[in-house]
Amino acid sequence: MKRGYEVVRDPHLNK
């Protein structure tokens, strides 16, 4: 994860 809003931009970082 990055900060919280970046996970939304990056689906692969969502989980």
Swiss-Prot record:
Q: Please share the entry's free-text remark on the cofactor.
A: Divalent metal cations. Prefers magnesium or manganese.
Q: Which cofactor does it need?
A: Mg(2+); Mn(2+)
Enzyme Commission identifier(s): 1.1.1.40
Which EC class is this protein assigned? oxidoreductase
One GO MF term attached to the UniProt entry: malate dehydrogenase (decarboxylating) (NADP+) activity
Q: Quick one: a GO biological-process term for this protein? A: protein homotetramerization
Q: Name one GO cellular component term.
A: cytoplasm
Predominant location: cytoplasm
Keywords associated with the record: Cytoplasm, NADP, Oxidoreductase
Annotated compartments: Cytoplasm
What does it catalyze? (S)-malate + NADP(+) = pyruvate + CO2 + NADPH; oxaloacetate + H(+) = pyruvate + CO2
Q: Which domain of life is it from?
A: Eukaryota
- Quaternary state and partners of this protein? Homotetramer.
Provide the function of this protein: Catalyzes the oxidative decarboxylation of (S)-malate in the presence of NADP (+) and divalent metal ions, and decarboxylation of oxaloacetate.
Q: Which family does it belong to?
A: Belongs to the malic enzymes family.
Stated name of the protein: NADP-dependent malic enzyme
Q: Which organism is it from?
A: Gallus gallus (Chicken)
Q: What is the lineage of its organism?
A: Eukaryota, Metazoa, Chordata, Craniata, Vertebrata
